[in-house]
């Protein structure tokens, strides 16, 4: 009998195994995207803000806007 030589296919746990593999993959991808965002977007933005405010003179810009007539309550 040739049918007795064939092994039975595994039918239990297929979904659990597939979900386990995909959850690990999704976790790895999400960590990669988070690291990419941090170093490609957040860090350069933080550096740009720090560079801007290092030389920022709020009194100077206030006086420029006051002279230009932006503020109605300040003469």
Curated annotation (Swiss-Prot):
Any matching Pfam family: COX6C
Instruction: List residues traversing the bilayer.
Output: 14-54
GO annotation, cellular component aspect: mitochondrial inner membrane
* Mitochondrial matrix topological intervals: 1-13
Its domain of life reads: Eukaryota
State which pathway it belongs to: Energy metabolism; oxidative phosphorylation
Major localization listed first in the record, in broad terms: mitochondrion
The subcellular location is: Mitochondrion inner membrane
Membrane-protein topology: Single-pass membrane protein
- Family matches, as InterPro entries: Cytochrome_c_oxidase_VIc, Cytochrome_c_oxidase_VIc/VIIs, Cytochrome_c_oxidase_VIc_sf
Keywords assigned:
Membrane, Mitochondrion, Mitochondrion inner membrane, Transmembrane, Transmembrane helix
The Gene Ontology biological process terms listed for this entry are: oxidative phosphorylation
Q: Which residues lie on this side of the membrane: Mitochondrial intermembrane?
A: 55-75
* SUPFAM superfamilies assigned: Mitochondrial cytochrome c oxidase subunit VIc
Q: Which Gene3D superfamilies match?
A: Mitochondrial cytochrome c oxidase subunit VIc/VIIs
Q: Which family does it belong to?
A: Belongs to the cytochrome c oxidase subunit 6c family.
Q: Which PANTHER family match?
A: CYTOCHROME C OXIDASE SUBUNIT 6C (PTHR48416:SF1)
Query: What is the recorded function of this protein according to its Swiss-Prot or TrEMBL entry?
Result: Component of the cytochrome c oxidase, the last enzyme in the mitochondrial electron transport chain which drives oxidative phosphorylation. The respiratory chain contains 3 multisubunit complexes succinate dehydrogenase (complex II, CII), ubiquinol-cytochrome c oxidoreductase (cytochrome b-c1 complex, complex III, CIII) and cytochrome c oxidase (complex IV, CIV), that cooperate to transfer electrons derived from NADH and succinate to molecular oxygen, creating an electrochemical gradient over the inner membrane that drives transmembrane transport and the ATP synthase.
Subunit field text: Component of the cytochrome c oxidase (complex IV, CIV), a multisubunit enzyme composed of 14 subunits. The complex is composed of a catalytic core of 3 subunits MT-CO1, MT-CO2 and MT-CO3, encoded in the mitochondrial DNA, and 11 supernumerary subunits COX4I, COX5A, COX5B, COX6A, COX6B, COX6C, COX7A, COX7B, COX7C, COX8 and NDUFA4, which are encoded in the nuclear genome.
Q: Would you tell me the protein name for this molecule? A: Cytochrome c oxidase subunit 6C
Query: Lineage of the source organism?
Result: Eukaryota, Metazoa, Chordata, Craniata, Vertebrata
Q: Which gene encodes it?
A: COX6C
């Amino acid at each position: 009998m040739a049918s007795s030589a064939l092994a039975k296919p595994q039918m239990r746990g297929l979904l659990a195994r597939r979900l386990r593999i995909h959850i690990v993959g999704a976790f790895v991808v999400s960590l990669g995207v988070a690291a990419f965002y941090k170093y490609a977007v957040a860090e350069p933005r933080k550096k740009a803000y720090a560079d801007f405010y290092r030389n920022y003179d709020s009194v100077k810009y206030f006086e420029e806007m006051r002279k230009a007539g932006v503020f109605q309550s300040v003469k």
